[in-house]
Amino acid sequence: MHFNATVTGYFTLPHKLFTSTLLLGIYLGDFGSSLFFIVSGASLALTVPAEQGPAQFYKRRARAVYPLFWLAWFVVFSYRFVAHPGSFGGARTVTLVLTLLGLDNFAVAAGWVGTDFACVGEWFLGSILFLYLLFPLLQRGLRKRPWLTWALTLAVCIPVHLLGWDARLVAVHIPEFLFGMTFLTLAGRTRCILAPLLLAGAVLAQPWDGKITCALAGAGVFILLALAAPLLDRPWPRVVGAQLAKISYAVFLVHHVLIQELAAHFDLAVLSRRDTALLFVVYLAATFAAAHALLWLQRTLRTGLAALCPQI
């Protein structure tokens, strides 16, 4: 998604490898984000026990999200600060608080600030952090009153999204997140019935709102992918999937930075289809290597800190 956006000059140049628009006019980036939020809801519902309290949940989420984010930010900030002097000249020092909270890119996207010290993480890190805040409440609601939870969620989120009160960055994704949580409780027959209904709903919603269309289509496609998943239940796909899952967050943190740096060395207007394909391969390899390097650096720092401060 970001590769395609970058090499087309954010859609000012012709596409070379991939289209940016899917059926029903759905933007590829929005579709990927929808699947991301659905998977996030499902994975949390699968791994977080019902008896875990909110405080413990927030503590574990913070430990999983912030250390690697701060490390990636420091590395990228250091590079940009030295290699591109003046990159952060317009940022107010107080906006470092947004970086500390993981909300710097979100704040720019939402229009809270014009510029800050954002380097990594992008807007949907902030969005998923807001969803993490809601997770204990949604989990309890689904367990006690699932229909009421869904009714209240839709009654609040759809108007907020349509009115743009959240800059259309959070509210539309709460039902996606909740759908991922709910998916685990659905019987097989229910899933088979729900998939075409959601896709039909996406068709009907197209003239109304693009992101709601994308949310419905994403949920329908997610069910179809889940139904097809047993076909990949083989040793090597499981191994590959497990390895990719280990580095997925690190990939998320570094991939956008890398494609921007790589693309800066090319005249995108004359970049051929072949060279675009080669750049894509280089980009994938660089992202894989950078993600592993970031995780290695985190492990090394943790080991060193544990040796210096064993009581922590």
Give residue spans per PLM region:
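Aromatic-anchored segments of alpha-helical transmembrane domains
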Residues: 1-4, 103-107, 153-165, 198-210, ...
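Functionally critical transmembrane alpha-helices in membrane proteins and complexes, commonly lining
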Residues: 1-49, 65-73, 248, 292
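Membrane-interface helix-loop-helix regions
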Residues: 16-24, 39, 65-127, 218-226
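Interfacial loop-to-helix transition and helix-capping segments at the boundaries
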Residues: 21-33, 111-127, 160-179, 192, ...
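Juxtamembrane transmembrane-helix termini
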Residues: 30-61, 71-88, 258, 262-263, ...
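Structural signal for the C-terminal ends of transmembrane alpha-helices
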Residues: 44-52, 80-82, 137-143, 181-190, ...
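Solvent-exposed interhelical
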Residues: 129-155, 165, 181-197
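Alpha-helical transmembrane segments of multi-pass integral membrane proteins
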Residues: 202-303
